[in-house]
Amino acid sequence: MAKSGGCGAGAGVGGGNGALTWVTLFDQNNAAKKEESETANKNDSSKKLSVERVYQKKTQLEHILLRPDTYIGSVEPLTQFMWVYDEDVGMNCREVTFVPGLYKIFDEILVNAADNKQRDKNMTCIKVSIDPESNIISIWNNGKGIPVVEHKVEKVYVPALIFGQLLTSSNYDDDEKKVTGGRNGYGAKLCNIFSTKFTVETACKEYKHSFKQTWMNNMMKTSEAKIKHFDGEDYTCITFQPDLSKFKMEKLDKDIVALMTRRAYDLAGSCRGVKVMFNGKKLPVNGFRSYVDLYVKDKLDETGVALKVIHELANERWDVCLTLSEKGFQQISFVNSIATTKGGRHVDYVVDQVVGKLIEVVKKKNKAGVSVKPFQVKNHIWVFINCLIENPTFDSQTKENMTLQPKSFGSKCQLSEKFFKAASNCGIVESILNWVKFKAQTQLNKKCSSVKYSKIKGIPKLDDANDAGGKHSLECTLILTEGDSAKSLAVSGLGVIGRDRYGVFPLRGKILNVREASHKQIMENAEINNIIKIVGLQYKKSYDDAESLKTLRYGKIMIMTDQDQDGSHIKGLLINFIHHNWPSLLKHGFLEEFITPIVKASKNKQELSFYSIPEFDEWKKHIENQKAWKIKYYKGLGTSTAKEAKEYFADMERHRILFRYAGPEDDAAITLAFSKKKIDDRKEWLTNFMEDRRQRRLHGLPEQFLYGTATKHLTYNDFINKELILFSNSDNERSIPSLVDGFKPGQRKVLFTCFKRNDKREVKVAQLAGSVAEMSAYHHGEQALMMTIVNLAQNFVGSNNINLLQPIGQFGTRLHGGKDAASPRYIFTMLSTLARLLFPAVDDNLLKFLYDDNQRVEPEWYIPIIPMVLINGAEGIGTGWACKLPNYDAREIVNNVRRMLDGLDPHPMLPNYKNFKGTIQELGQNQYAVSGEIFVVDRNTVEITELPVRTWTQVYKEQVLEPMLNGTDKTPALISDYKEYHTDTTVKFVVKMTEEKLAQAEAAGLHKVFKLQTTLTCNSMVLFDHMGCLKKYETVQDILKEFFDLRLSYYGLRKEWLVGMLGAESTKLNNQARFILEKIQGKITIENRSKKDLIQMLVQRGYESDPVKAWKEAQEKAAEEDETQNQHDDSSSDSGTPSGPDFNYILNMSLWSLTKEKVEELIKQRDAKGREVNDLKRKSPSDLWKEDLAAFVEELDKVESQEREDVLAGMSGKAIKGKVGKPKVKKLQLEETMPSPYGRRIIPEITAMKADASKKLLKKKKGDLDTAAVKVEFDEEFSGAPVEGAGEEALTPSVPINKGPKPKREKKEPGTRVRKTPTSSGKPSAKKVKKRNPWSDDESKSESDLEETEPVVIPRDSLLRRAAAERPKYTFDFSEEEDDDADDDDDDNNDLEELKVKASPITNDGEDEFVPSDGLDKDEYTFSPGKSKATPEKSLHDKKSQDFGNLFSFPSYSQKSEDDSAKFDSNEEDSASVFSPSFGLKQTDKVPSKTVAAKKGKPSSDTVPKPKRAPKQKKVVEAVNSDSDSEFGIPKKTTTPKGKGRGAKKRKASGSENEGDYNPGRKTSKTTSKKPKKTSFDQDSDVDIFPSDFPTEPPSLPRTGRARKEVKYFAESDEEEDDVDFAMFN
């Protein structure tokens, strides 16, 4: 049968008659008759074909020849681009015309030869021979030959079976996993069918025979098989002559040969260990990597660099190469040596991995802001894959697209991190970013109009010039003003110069720093787009020539901003905007500025204008009688009147300053100021400026200024280095605190105002903010000031250790990190009683106060008695520098100061955060680990009772527990439920999970799994020193020592001042007493005498002119000599003139002074003042300091005691006055918030973290050359929590404990601090602070005075208090008002959000996410609620003091060196806070005390001693120690389950076995203990949750029993092995 248009062979093919005939199947005549018959049928539609002729059956062979496209693809010529190998060119992609069917039958034989390598690993060679002239193709391999044996079933030889009969194959056993290309049993047979001659030769050494047989005429005819005896090596050779007529070809043309040649090269690259000979020559390919070079040879990327190929042999089955593609996605892949030209699942499998990694890198580097999708990344990839897949499947017999699912591949391709890192550096990422920039530029260009319009619409607040966009557009100037008020000023001035050539457009604050902004930011920035639209600018257009400038609507831009530092910043940002996008415009004088006076001095009708403060200061120095001049400061353009505006514009020559381009130095200056890449240069720039300013001040030289009377123009270099640098420096001053007082200017202004107001009653925060702005000349928004006030008053965990303002109202909690503070309109505050003890008023006389707007404001810095920068920590990001300091314990600092006063070195200190109950451990220098607290309660319950510092409760719940409960795309659900029992000050999550998952989680580390461990490096301790210069400090001790030296010198100055002042007052009282006595004795008469005579008489009799006034005038004169530039009015110095003596202090005394009582009182005052002066002279500056410290510690005790009482008032379970109800309800509710008494504490393990920290430190030492200052970046990381375990690191003692019996407790100085609990030095967790570019225009991202301190709390240890020595109160008899204190904060507070370290507990750097496995054998994990293992009795003696546990908290651990023991005497160790939780232990219990931890090795978490119960307290008889680590330092009691409590005996003296035991079920019984009476609460208290102030003597013997009680939440677990929780808090 023949059909027109079908595939045929024989004489009719290519004859042009359009009829194809099957010569070998049908007779020619029959075929012709059939054709005639069909023609007749067409002519006669009434005749129909028979059913037999319509429905036919063909043999398999007939079907293959009739429908070849089903088997080998199309037999029609196809033209397309393909990779081919040409002898003259090599591997290249060009347009070729070939027949896919012919290419396929060749490929089938070639793949069969390659498959033999998989069957025979000894195969080493494949020979391919193509003879186009004779149309002969031969493929030979030396692999194992085909068995030359007769098939017992089919009765033919195996070679004849598999090459000459259809549907025969060795690949039908799908249970056998093979990595060959053959699959369906068609391949070689198809080649036979479509060949005129097909010869098989094979030799099998195993069967010692060779075989040769030939088929002809499309497998229709065959010759007899020739079988011979054979003793040589195995081989197989297939030789065939394609039936070209079937493919409509006459010969093997150049294109098909080039394609076949490429397939030979493919084989050489994809068959490992096989050499390929082509036409007798060995192909120069050695492995897959060299094969890939054939493709990329001589190819360059867009930068002209040769393509870089990344290669990785993932395993024996996967070989992957990657490089950059510039023609969209390209892939060259092989599956079992089959060329999958269309790719498939194997390609997607590899490419998806690569794209996933690359897109992460691109997103990090993508500053353009254009969203990048995976397919766009894929378009830049060229991947080469050679893989072996088990039993691959394809979508057709052509095998161009592999369809097998990855799970069935039989192997995995896990590419290494090294591969991905290299992939991100091979040019792909750069190419993607270039494409992103191009796309971004295209989008930006759409924002610009290439058409010049005379009128534009849709831009609000634009006052367009009338000639803008017309023929005079180049003569038009656009005035850009700072805000609407400045626009009003400009519009007023336009009345003088006209509106035709001047347009006005107001800016809303600072514009965007386009040099570092993302594409998205630029696209969405309305101001940038408006300026471009108004001026007519076009991106990427060069304005080099005058002709191009004619396309602009305005020929110039005039910048009109305030004359302050923020105004300078706006000018700089506009210059940066033009320079970054159109640098050529600067060369045409495109920019200019309009300046206005910053100060005006007027006298009579004379008026002088000054355009910079240094210029004004210079004028003041040389002017006489400056008080006759009226001085007015202009802080903004809004200060000027409309009349003044007209005056400014009328004198345009004076007020317009042109910017001139001076060459590359201008470009360099602009880049220096605004480029992120110039951060180190910017540091040096600012350092040089500060040093220059310092030297000028030392030598009395004036500061540099720009705008003199003759200034008409300036270069960009001058603007950057003389004006803009002032903003950069002020940016640092706003953001980085002073070492001396720890304040930023805004905070200092608040404190100054509070000192000046000296409120005795609380005041609203909003009202106080207004008062601060008024009294301290605060020039920024009051909202930021209110937040600064709120921040100073916050006292929750993670904020301030000492809050200087009182939080009266809702000032924020740890639930939201302070963000839940109420509106400033509703909350109140006032000075803390500690404030004036930390900042003594007498020191105000020694400070250098600043002046602003001719107003005396806050001092340069206050001088506290201890370094507040360490107490409350510090954090800020400025220009070039950043600062980060954690909090430290006030009492520890006080003790170190005392040591230094005694000539000793300070002890090392660890971060400490008030009321933090977790552990803080030192990893290395300035590196700490912060851990929360987690307990295992039972087989499927854990309890989280503390979070890492600055991990806020709500954030933790949403970002950690919720994903654990619900699961995410990447991780399955881990927990089954959780409940919350926390308060605003405490944390308690009760988490439920399956026993198997809990076992797995504990094996992986509960702290890691629940993200309760964070790390932080503190290498950014940058502060302003007392000279106003930035300085980087390496250690906290360096800060303490520098502060100590400065503070001690100021105590010397204070003594001098006091001696002088008190001496003058003593002289005054002495003169007054002498005058009264002489008057009474009649030695002096004043009646009826002239004033002049009286003064003369007093002078003659040796009376001194007012000594107090004279002394004060002398002090003022000295101050004026030191700083003559600040000669301002001062009310305290106007009481008299130095021209003559002043005896008003004597002559103004009332007649009452002559009475006997007044005389005696005056004499007493004189004598007392004399003694006061003598006492003062005998004291050293150190004595004065110690008195201040004692008074401070005494008040600190009172404040913290009051805090505890305040909390107790609402939590003790007592009925409140006026309230009706049962306190039992409150008790039950309260117990819910308490930790479970059955929990087994999990000890944080930091061994792995220490190793990581050490590695980072080594790397830093190798590459760290920056010793002057730190980069604007924090090295803090959220590091993965290590596996838990009882490690020495967790219990290393801060103070080694003496072994022998303790002596009787002695009284100690107030403030003495004994660290009882091993504390770990950890730092607060924080999300990687996103670094703010200090040059950002965005006000919302500017600096903030709000300090988000890094809370890391070490439990405060108890101390024995005595009444602090009464600090002398110096009384001064002069009545003049005290000098005002002021607090300067030029801080924008704009960087509030970015300066906040957003506590995120979610990241664990370098740690894999924990994914629980469901297949854990229960035997692998066992809870051991059994009894604890007995430990040597000696361990008890290692523990010398035990504290009772705080029911609401757990102590923090601090690692310290053993020499810390010298810090406190042995008696101090006896005093432990009621709130430092620890428990008495059995003799047999293993005590993980400090000594045990340090000397005995690691305590096991399964063998932790039980906490003992404290006796129920009756009432508080002693003030509880304020060193407590508890919330607000509140004493708390623990309760235990019924039947488990011990006898309710009090602690005994050293050696008592009952010490530390505690029984909430009984009343406290008296004992013979010599210890002070224990603190207890009223017996009617239903819930005794706070242990009282027990003496912390060492326990000697254990108690044996426990009293039972129903509901207990915080005591020891029933299972002794689970009691690791509280006993180790020593």
Curated annotation (Swiss-Prot):
The record marks 825 as: Transition state stabilizer. ATP binds at residues 112, 141, 169-171, 182-189, 397-399. Binds two Mg(2+) per subunit. The magnesium ions form salt bridges with both the protein and the DNA. Can also accept other divalent metal cations, such as Mn(2+) or Ca(2+). PROSITE patterns: TOPO_IIA, TOPOISOMERASE_II, TOPRIM. Expressed in the tonsil, spleen, lymph node, thymus, skin, pancreas, testis, colon, kidney, liver, brain and lung. Also found in breast, colon and lung carcinomas, Hodgkin's disease, large-cell non-Hodgkin's lymphoma, lymphocytic lymphomas and seminomas. Residues 1506-1512 are annotated as: Interaction with PLSCR1. One of its GO terms (cellular component) is nucleolus. Changing residue 482 to Q: Strongly reduced enzyme activity. Mg(2+) 2 binds at residues 562, 564. The keyword Nucleotidyltransferase does not apply. The record marks 510, 513, 682-683, 744, 778, 952 as: Interaction with DNA. Mg(2+) 1 binds at residues 482, 562. The active site is at residue 826. Changing residue 515 to Q: Slightly reduced enzyme activity. There is a cross-link at residues 33-34, 177-178, 228, 299, 367, 373, 437, 439, 446, 600, 605, 635, 643, 646, 676, 712, 1092, 1214, 1217, 1226-1227, 1250, 1262, 1271, 1323, 1327, 1398, 1440, 1456, 1490 (Glycyl lysine isopeptide (Lys-Gly) (interchain with G-Cter in SUMO2)). Residues 363-365, 1011-1020 are annotated as: Interaction with DNA. (Microbial infection) Deubiquitinated by Epstein-Barr virus BPLF1; leading to stabilized SUMOylated TOP2A trapped in cleavage complexes, which halts the DNA damage response to TOP2A-induced double-strand DNA breaks. SUMOylated. GO terms for biological process: axonogenesis; B cell differentiation; cellular response to ATP; cellular response to hydrogen peroxide; cellular senescence; DNA topological change; forebrain development; neuron migration. Eukaryotic topoisomerase I and II can relax both negative and positive supercoils, whereas prokaryotic enzymes relax only negative supercoils. It is linked to Defects in TOP2B may be involved in global developmental delay with autism spectrum disorder (ASD). Homodimer. Interacts with KIAA1210. Interacts with PLSCR1. Belongs to the type II topoisomerase family. This is DNA topoisomerase 2-beta. It comes from Homo sapiens. The lineage of its organism: Eukaryota, Metazoa, Chordata, Craniata, Vertebrata. The gene is TOP2B.
